[in-house]
């Protein structure tokens, strides 16, 4: 994220132009704004999402118009808001455009924009209008560690892009660093068997809570909450945690939580002095979240999309000094584990097929719109 934050903040100090960062997850934008605030960028960096109150949103629109914000984080859905577009247009008219239009986790443009989140296509169309109005001075930038050749080609079909820092014929690098080891284990489909594997994993690695954190990725919000309770009980039975500590050491995190609860859980998980060191999370914690000492990752079951898996595994070992102090290195890599059953693979294929619109579906939608 510093690759776009640095230029945006530096240039804005001279041009006073606004940079927009389009990001797919609320938790991700709040994390980045919080980190910038800790570095002293308090009044000129902000975010807009559904957790903000009416008064907060109104105040941010005022700050946009007044030229007080240098970087604004938004979800793609925000570009459906007439009030937002009005505030943005007013600022752009005064400044003759934006400094940067930035797409963070840009692989989501294709992965979700084509299949699940048409809002991304709407944002790109809006960007094209901006460029038509203000010319090529407005830079559109896309950032991601997990853009495959297929996703790159899909994005390029919508809006021409150029890879920076590599030759045109050079393959995209492997986003998984050499100090991370990925293991996969075939298990029975039911939750009790998966739970036992996770307990065995925790026993085997003897996790020290004051130097390491552990993530358990679950598919659904209910799974997160259920797993946190079941695991607390099993770790108590196994003698790994006391009854009192088991209720404090394990938590859950997902986008359906109240904003304050989600923020509190994130703060606790990041604080090495807090007993919370195992977090059951959905993909809401899988992109861009920067906890420096996550040294253990387990997937309860594989994600439906490979890019999600790479992003989630990529949460591990973000701080070299911390993972070396915890005993990890290229010769003794951080252990990640993905549990899967034959039924998981079958269901993933079914979900991908169900997510594709057929001509029959499109015809039904057309009839419904016209009726």
Q: What is the predicted role of each segment?
A:
Residues 4-44, 131-137, 211:
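Conserved SF1/SF2 helicase motif Ia
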Residues 18-24, 73, 140-142, 212-220, ...:
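Conserved RecA-like ASCE P-loop NTPase motor core of nucleic-acid helicases/translocases
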Residues 20, 26-74, 249-253:
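Conserved nucleic-acid-binding Ia/Ib motif block in the N-terminal RecA-like helicase ATPase lobe
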Residues 63-87, 269-289:
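Conserved two-lobed SF2 helicase motor
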Residues 70, 77-80, 84-135, 139:
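SF2 helicase catalytic motif II
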Residues 130-133, 137-139, 146-204:
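Interdomain hinge/linker at the junction between the two RecA-like core domains of SF2 helicases
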Residues 205-231, 235-285, 289-371:
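C-terminal helicase lobe
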């Amino acid at each position: 994220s510093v690759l776009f934050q640095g230029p945006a903040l530096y240039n804005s100090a001279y041009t006073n132009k606004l940079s927009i960062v389009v990001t797919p997850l609320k938790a991700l934008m709040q994390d980045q704004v919080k980190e910038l605030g800790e570095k002293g960028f308090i009044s000129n960096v902000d975010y807009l999402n559904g957790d903000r109150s009416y008064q907060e949103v109104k105040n941010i629109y005022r700050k946009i118009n007044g030229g007080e914000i240098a970087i604004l984080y938004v979800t793609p859905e925000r570009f459906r808001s007439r009030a937002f577009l009005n505030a943005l247009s007013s600022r752009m008219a005064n400044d003759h455009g934006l400094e940067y239009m930035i797409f963070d986790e840009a692989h989501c443009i294709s992965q979700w924009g084509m299949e699940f989140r048409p809002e991304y296509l709407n944002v790109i169309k809006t960007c094209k209008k901006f460029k038509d109005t203000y010319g090529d001075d407005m830079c559109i930038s896309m950032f991601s560690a997990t853009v495959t050749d297929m996703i790159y080609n899909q994005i390029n079909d919508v809006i021409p892009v150029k890879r920076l820092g590599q030759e045109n014929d050079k393959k995209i690098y492997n986003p998984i660093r050499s100090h991370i080891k990925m293991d996969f284990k075939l298990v029975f489909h039911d939750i009790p068997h998966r739970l036992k594997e996770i307990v065995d994993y925790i026993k085997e690695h003897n996790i020290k809570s004051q130097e390491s954190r552990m993530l358990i990725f679950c598919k659904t919000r209910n799974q997160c909450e259920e797993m946190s309770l079941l695991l607390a009980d099993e770790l108590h039975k196994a003698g790994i945690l006391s009854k009192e500590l088991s209720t404090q050491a394990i938590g859950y995190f997902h986008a359906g939580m109240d904003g304050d609860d989600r923020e509190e859980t994130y703060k606790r998980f990041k604080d090495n002095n807090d007993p919370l060191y195992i977090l059951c999370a959905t993909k809401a914690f899988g992109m861009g979240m920067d906890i420096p000492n996550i040294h253990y990752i387990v997937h309860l079951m594989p994600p439906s999309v490979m890019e999600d898996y790479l992003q989630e595994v990529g949460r591990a070992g973000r701080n070299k000094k911390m993972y070396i102090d915890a005993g990890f290195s290229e010769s003794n890599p951080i252990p990640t584990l993905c549990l899967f059953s034959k039924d998981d693979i079958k269901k993933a294929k079914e979900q991908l097929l169900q997510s594709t619109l057929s001509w029959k579906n499109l015809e039904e939608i057309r009839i419904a719109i016209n009726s």
